[in-house]
From Swiss-Prot:
The enzyme's E.C. designation: 6.1.1.15
Entry domain remark: Consists of three domains: the N-terminal catalytic domain, the editing domain and the C-terminal anticodon-binding domain.
GO BP annotations listed: prolyl-tRNA aminoacylation
Compartments where found: Cytoplasm
NCBIfam families per the UniProt record, alphabetical: PRK09194.1, proS_fam_II
GO cellular component annotations of the record: cytosol
Catalytic activity: tRNA(Pro) + L-proline + ATP = L-prolyl-tRNA(Pro) + AMP + diphosphate
CDD domains assigned to the protein according to its UniProt record, in alphabetical order: ProRS-INS, ProRS_anticodon_short, ProRS_core_prok
Primary localization class, coarse: cytoplasm
Top-level taxonomy: Bacteria, Pseudomonadati, Pseudomonadota, Gammaproteobacteria, Thiotrichales
Protein name, per record: Proline--tRNA ligase
Transmembrane parts of this sequence: none
Length: 565
C-alpha cells in the first residue's frame, strides 16, 4: 500500500479522558477516532490490525473444528425473556422498538439466538458435538465507558458455542478450546497466562480466563513460580498451614488501653505490634439477615467471591452497618475481636495459625493481647476467606505465589444446561430419551486484544506491535521521494519486490519531512523501517531499523531481503 492511497491520520492532540497508553497511542496513531462515548470509528490502519487478529482467530477456530456463522445483531425481546435476561441485564442492555412497537435489543452476547437456532435444527445426539462461532460487533451500554476500546460500549468479539449430549463430550471440546486460545495468543505473540476463574452466576465446574500480562490490567492474577498453577485473584487459594503444629502459649490475656485507635495500621505503629500477630474482625450480614464475624490476619484482605460461596452464608452478603455492629457488640468497628464474641466466627486459616494474637476487646478504646485459639476461643469455623498475597505457598505445594496485573482477553466456561433447559433445546439421546443439550461458551475480545498488545509492548515513541498483527510489516521511508529520481526509483522497485515476495509493505510516498516520517513510523509501529536516501545510495546502502530492538544497520538491499524473508 502507498501512503497516499490510504489515510494516515496521526495527531498530537489527546482528550483528557485518554489515560491508558493504549488509548492514547491508538488515537495519536490514527487507528481509531471517537464518534461518541465508548463508540469508535476504526480507521484504515486500525482496521488492518483488527483484521489480522480476526484472521488468526478464524484460522485457529477452523483448525479446531469449529464452523463459522453469523447471528443477527438485533435480537427480539422474546428470546431474552425466555431466560429472564431481558430484565436481569439491566441498563447495559440497549433496548429499542420497531415501527410496530415490538421490543428488540442490540445483542450484548448471543446465547439465546444460538440456542434458538440449535433447538430448531439439532434433534439427535447423532448431530453432536457441534461447535459454532461468529466474529461480530456487540453493544453493552456501559455506565462509564473508559480506556478506549479496552472498555467500550461497542466492541468486536469472537463468541463460540458448543453443543453436546453429555458432560464428557463437553469437557473434551472445552479442553480443545483451551488449547485453541493458547494457540491464538501464541500466534499473535503475546505474553499471557490462562488462569482458573470464578464461574459466577453462570455456574458449571470449569472456567478459565486468558489474561494478557500488562501493568495497566484491571485484573489481578496469581501464579506459582514453581509450577503451572495460576488463578484469578477471586479464586486463587494457597497451601493451608499445618495447624496441628501450633504450640500452646503460657502467656495470659492482657487488656490494654488503646484510645482513638481504630485501624490495624495505627495500632501497630503506636503500640509497636507486628501486623502479622494481629487480626481484623469484620461483621457481615447474609441475605437471610444472619450476622457473622469474619476474621483474617491484619495484613490480609477479605475475598468477596470466596465468602459468597461459603455454605454457612446465604449469598449475597453485605457489610453490617455501624448501628448494627454497635447493637450486637456494644462497641464500634475498630474495637471488635474474637474473645467473648456474641456471633458466629468464621476465621481464615492464616488467622487461626497465629499464637498470642492481638485483637479488639469488644469495648471501645481497648484491645486484647495474647489471645489464643482453642484456649480462649473455642466456638469458631475455619475457611479460606482471604485474597492470596505474594509469598503464599502454592496450593500444589510447588513454589510460592506471585501476583501480577492482567487484561482479560478471553473467557471459556461450561454452560451445561443453563440456557438449553429453560429454552427447551432438547435432543433425543442414545438412550432414546429427550434431554437438554449441554453447552460450552467461549468468548474472545478481538478489539480488546489489540489494546492489550499495545499495553504490553510500547515505548516513549509509540507502539511496538507483535509482527503478526502490525499494520504493515515493513515501511519504506524515502527521503526526498518527490525530489530525487534515484531515491524514487530505488524505493519504487523495492516496494514492488517486497510485494512480490508476499510481504505486507507500506511505501511512504507522501513527501513528508524525514522527521515526520520517522515519528509516524515509530508511533504507528511498523515492524521494520527502511530509510532510503541519496547519501547512502551513493555507497549502495540503505538504513534498516528494527522497531522492537531499535537496532539500526546500514546494509545493502540484498541483505535487507534476507532479513525480511
Amino acid at each position: 500500500m502507498k501512503a497516499t492511497q490510504t489515510l494516515i491520520a496521526t495527531t498530537k492532540e489527546l482528550p483528557k479522558e485518554a489515560v491508558l497508553i493504549s488509548h492514547q497511542y491508538m488515537l495519536k496513531a490514527g487507528l481509531i477516532k471517537k464518534l461518541a462515548s465508548g463508540i469508535y470509528t476504526w480507521m484504515p490502519l486500525g482496521l488492518k490490525v483488527l483484521q489480522k487478529i480476526q484472521n488468526i482467530v478464524r484460522d485457529e477456530m477452523n483448525k479446531a473444528g469449529a464452523s463459522e456463522l453469523l447471528l443477527p445483531s438485533i435480537l427480539p425481546s422474546e428470546l431474552l425473556q425466555e431466560t429472564h435476561r431481558w430484565d436481569k441485564f439491566g441498563p447495559e442492555l440497549l433496548k429499542l422498538h420497531d415501527r410496530h412497537n415490538r421490543d428488540f435489543c442490540y445483542g450484548p452476547t448471543h446465547e439465546e439466538p444460538i440456542v434458538d437456532m440449535a433447538r430448531d435444527t439439532i434433534k439427535s445426539y447423532k448431530q453432536l458435538p457441534l461447535n459454532l462461532y461468529q466474529i461480530q460487533t456487540k453493544f453493552r451500554d456501559e455506565i462509564r465507558p473508559r480506556f478506549g476500546v479496552m472498555r467500550a460500549r461497542e466492541f468486536i468479539m469472537k463468541d463460540a458455542y458448543s453443543f453436546h449430549e453429555n458432560s464428557q463430550c463437553l469437557r473434551n471440546t472445552y479442553n480443545t478450546m483451551y488449547a485453541t486460545y493458547c494457540n491464538i495468543l501464541d500466534k499473535i505473540g503475546l505474553a499471557y497466562r490462562p488462569v482458573k476463574a470464578d464461574t459466577g452466576a453462570i455456574g458449571g465446574d470449569n472456567s478459565h480466563e486468558f489474561q494478557v500480562l500488562a501493568n495497566a490490567g484491571e485484573d489481578i492474577i496469581c501464579y506459582s513460580n514453581g509450577s503451572d498453577y495460576a488463578a484469578n485473584i477471586e479464586l486463587a487459594t494457597y497451601a493451608k498451614p499445618d495447624l496441628s503444629k501450633r504450640v500452646n502459649s503460657q502467656n495470659t490475656i492482657e487488656k490494654i488501653h488503646t484510645p482513638n485507635i481504630k485501624t490495624i495500621e495505627k495500632l501497630c505503629k503506636e503500640m509497636s505490634f507486628d501486623i502479622k500477630k494481629t487480626i481484623k474482625t469484620m461483621v457481615i450480614k447474609d441475605a437471610e439477615g444472619n450476622f457473622f464475624a469474619l476474621v483474617i490476619r491484619g495484613d490480609h484482605e477479605l475475598n468477596e467471591t470466596k465468602i459468597n460461596k461459603l455454605e454457612q452464608i446465604v449469598a449475597p452478603y453485605t457489610l453490617a452497618t455501624k448501628e448494627e455492629i454497635f447493637s450486637i457488640f456494644n462497641a464500634n468497628p475498630g474495637s471488635l475481636g474474637i474473645y467473648n464474641c456474641p456471633i458466629s466466627i468464621i476465621a481464615d486459616y492464616s488467622a487461626i495459625a497465629i499464637i498470642d494474637l492481638v485483637c479488639g476487646a469488644n469495648q471501645d478504646d481497648y484491645h486484647f493481647t495474647n489471645v489464643n485459639w482453642d484456649r480462649d476461643v473455642t466456638n469458631y469455623q475455619i475457611a479460606d476467606i482471604r485474597n492470596v498475597v505474594t509469598g503464599d505457598i502454592s496450593p500444589d505445594g510447588k513454589g510460592t505465589l506471585e501476583l501480577t496485573n492482567g487484561i482479560e482477553v478471553g473467557h471459556i466456561f461450561e454452560l451445561e444446561d443453563v440456557y438449553s433447559k429453560p429454552m427447551n433445546a432438547n435432543i433425543i439421546g442414545q438412550d432414546g430419551k429427550s434431554k437438554p443439550m449441554l453447552m460450552g461458551c467461549y468468548g474472545f475480545g478481538v478489539s480488546r486484544v489489540m489494546a492489550a498488545a499495545i499495553e504490553q509492548s510500547h515505548d516513549e515513541n509509540g507502539i511496538i506491535w507483535p509482527e503478526s498483527i502490525a499494520p504493515y510489516q515493513v515501511a519504506i521511508l524515502p527521503i526526498n521521494y518527490n525530489k530525487s529520481d534515484k531515491v524514487k526509483e530505488v524505493a519504487d522497485k523495492l516496494y514492488q519486490d517486497l510485494l512480490g515476495d508476499g510481504i505486507d509493505v507500506l511505501l511512504d510516498d507522501r513527501g513528508a519531512r524525514p522527521g515526520v516520517m520517522f515519528a509516524d513510523a515509530d508511533l504507528i509501529g511498523y515492524s521494520h523501517h527502511v530509510v532510503i536516501g541519496d547519501r547512502l545510495l551513493e555507497q549502495g546502502l540503505i538504513e534498516y531499523k528494527n522497531r522492537k530492538t531499535q537496532e539500526k544497520q546500514e546494509i545493502t538491499i540484498t541483505e535487507l531481503i534476507k532479513i525480511l524473508t
